[in-house]
A protein has these predicted regions:
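Solvent-exposed loop/turn segments at secondary-structure junctions
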Residues: 43-46, 62-63, 85-89, 112-116, ...
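Short acidic-hydrophobic, aromatic-tinged amphipathic segments that line or gate anion-handling sites
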Residues: 58-59
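Second-shell loop/turn segments in exported
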Residues: 11-18, 53, 82-86, 103
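Short amphipathic alpha-helix with an adjacent loop that forms part of the alpha/beta core around
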Residues: 30, 65-76
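Short active-site oxyanion
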Residues: 32-38, 53-54, 78, 104-105
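Flexible, polar/low-complexity N-terminal or interdomain linker segments that lie immediately upstream
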Residues: 1-37, 45-49, 129
Length: 129
């Protein structure tokens, strides 16, 4: 079934509930049952060093370049954005951009890469081959 999205993100610009925040547990469940698309908002270098298994690299600064890819995505799919964790806002920015494109199911995983590897969840990339 659908993964419950708990909290509502507070947009620092005061735009209210633009995207949801998803917990590590819920992000992992969505990963395991294959319902979510994970988007890595970090740089290509960071992505290649290591990323959540199956995630697609979509750096926030290259968002416009990614529009052809995004326009082909199913709007029914849950999209989960992430970056490095607590010190990184790129996942929130990316989630906000996706919401502006009218993707209805967008969540940002604020714990990000750091929380995911700390939990020992599936990863890919050069770091651990």
């Amino acid at each position: 079934g659908d993964v419950a999205i708990a909290a509502i993100a507070i947009d620092p610009n005061g735009n209210g509930d633009i995207a949801s925040n998803i917990s590590l547990k819920d992000a992992y469940l969505a990963h395991q049952n294959g319902t979510a698309l994970f988007l890595d908002a970090r740089s290509p270098d960071e992505y290649e060093a290591g990323h959540i298994f199956g995630a697609v690299n979509l750096p926030t600064h290259a968002f416009m370049d990614s529009l052809p890819y995004l326009e082909n995505l199913s709007p029914n799919r849950l999209i989960i954005t992430y970056c490095d964790g607590a010190d990184c806002n790129a996942s929130i920015d990316l989630a906000a951009n996706l919401k502006l494109m009218d993707f209805p199911k967008v969540a940002y995983f604020f714990g990000g890469w750091q929380e995911w590897i700390d939990a020992g969840y599936p990863i890919a990339g050069n770091t651990h081959e």
